[in-house]
Amino acid sequence: MKRSRLRTSGILAVVALVAAVVGFVFTRTGSSGPKALTKADVAKTAQTVVDKAIEKAANAPARSVAVYQAIAPSLVVIRTDEATADAATAAPSFATPTVPNRAEQKVGLGTGVIINADGDILTANHVIVGAKLITVTFADGSATTATIKSQEPKTDIAVLAPDQAPSVIVPAVIGGGVQIGDEAYAVGHPLGLTRSLSAGVISGLDRSIKVENGSTLEGLIQFDAAVNPGNSGGPLLNRNGQVVGIVTGLANPSEQGFFVGIGFAVPISTAGGAAGGPPQ
């Protein structure tokens, strides 16, 4: 019996990965003493553990899926009508040297995110500046007009108050700071393709960008998750689905205004301050 136990101990040392399972077998043996394990027993137990781990991983959602599911109920489509010439030129799409003047544009599309239990919406100021009519559509499909609650042109941040809140309000979860190399996700309505998700990384911090109206936006987050016109005002998210920034524009060497790998967002700490306090 002593040799049997020594052999058992030796096998257990080799298969430490399944020690917990093997230990369970030992505790359930009767008074006749422990049964010696064979190589077949160990191999079968190890395979069972591996199979269960694979099954668990397969059933778990991909991180991008979890990120989207976390933000989707808080996402808002913002439509502006009768935009003025000022609204067109204020959009900081960060082209080089300037973006084309879109004074003739009558309808605009942007993104916003619910930030509190009242249904207030955080977005980019250039999305709504100069608009005569603002309509917001919530995740449940309900739509209502909205009024501007606050604006901060220096940071390109605005807060909208919906005239009628949805029946179920799900405020976004607010995150903290980021560092270069962190995963980054952008969700919005690029080119009218509503509720689109793109993924990338944080590429740089504390960027300063001069926009078309001559002002400078400072302290921006640079990221490479794809964004295009329509993403403005939407959330930049971390790997946990928490809002870490508000998308404000993209850099482009051409006049087309489409994404080439450099996007910018206002940090949520700045956006919260511009909105009158840290979003809850």
Each language-model region and where it sits:
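C-terminal recognition in membrane/secretory proteostasis and scaffolding
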Residues: 1-44, 66, 111, 147, ...
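Active-site loop architecture of trypsin-fold serine endopeptidases
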Residues: 8-10, 131-134, 166-169, 187-200, ...
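Glycine-biased strand-turn-strand hairpin within the trypsin-fold
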Residues: 32-121, 129-132, 142-143, 164-167, ...
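Interdomain regulatory linker/hinge segments that flank or connect interaction modules
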Residues: 51-53, 183, 264-280
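Soluble non-cytosolic domains of exported or imported proteins
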Residues: 58, 62, 106-109, 175-178, ...
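Residue-level recognition of beta-strand microenvironments
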Residues: 78-81, 115-117, 125, 149-151, ...
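A secondary-structure boundary/capping signal
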Residues: 79, 123-124, 198, 267
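Conserved active-site neighborhood of the chymotrypsin/trypsin-like protease fold
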Residues: 109-111, 116-195
